[in-house]
Amino acid sequence: MMTSPQPASKGFSRAFWVSSTVELFERMAYYAVFIVLTIYLSNILGFNDFESSMISGLFSGGLYLLPIFTGAYADKIGFRKSMIIAFSLLSIGYLGLGLLPTLLEAAGLVEYGETTRFSGLPDSNDRWMIIPVLFVIMVGGSFIKSIISGSVAKETTEATRARGYSIFYMMVNIGAFTGKTVVDPLRNVIGEQAYIYINYFSAAMTVLALLAVILLYKSAHTAGEGKSMREIGQGFLRIITNWRLLILILIVTGFWMVQQQLYATMPKYVIRMAGETAKPGWIANVNPFVVVCCVSFITRWMAKRTAITSMN
């Protein structure tokens, strides 16, 4: 008979704290790269503004679409195996982002330094090797979108769930804040090469998360209990025929379309308007900083109010 692991801290299990901590590492890795992804695509790989925006946008869209399928697969194999798969893919992907420019430079298509000097890369099809690399990150990240929050739900009770998610989202935003503070100081020291080396930082963070899961994540809620593809399809059909839910999705989509401009266009805009000494990472950090400072207070304040009241 399986027994529940002893709690690592009053009210929460060790699995809860491991899940929250590896999410912090994952967010550090993701935002360290994503805050400069469009700049990386243009300044390192030679894509124009339209191409880099399209690639970044499709990457983000896929990252939020794939959890429909990867989440169902994660349910079948269990959270621990899913996290191992996710962080393995993310580590490979971020390492690939760092190594790809080295291969392109070795091919004589570009020379990297404080500033990038192209010698054929913008006209070469070799730069499109970035697509499979980003796809690996997209698949790994799509697992994380569903399994970490699902693990938190499994490891909390009705009495501790609100506080548990408050802690979880605080860790998410600490990770987002910390990740975006790395690239600007690095850019001040080594110039545009920072957009390459930041990927090794992200790979290191996801390797740490992978080791934490392998060595520390033990949960009573590991058995797969997933749905069939038919059940997933039926559930999806119910969603798209629920007009109230669709309206909510459209409202939330509008918010995220605006919010994503912090990463799609703002970094390039700030650097081009204010010069190379500008720090877009710190500008983008206003959002997670406010969340970290206010999330506990807001959670307590809205605890006895309905979700609709909170959203309004």
Question: Which sequence ranges carry the predicted segments?
Answer:
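Juxtamembrane intracellular "pre-TM" segments in multi-pass secondary transporters
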Residues: 2-13, 223-249
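Extracytoplasmic gate region of multi-pass secondary transporters
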Residues: 31-39, 179, 243-284
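Central cavity-lining transmembrane alpha-helices of secondary-active solute carriers
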Residues: 57-72, 285-298
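Glycine-rich segments within core transmembrane alpha-helices of 12-TM secondary carriers
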Residues: 62-63, 162-187, 203-209, 284-288
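C-terminal ends and interior cores of transmembrane alpha-helices
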Residues: 88-125
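Symmetry-related core transmembrane helices of the 12-TM Major Facilitator Superfamily/SLC fold
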Residues: 131, 196-215
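Intracellular juxtamembrane helix-capping segments at the cytosolic ends
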Residues: 143-157, 270
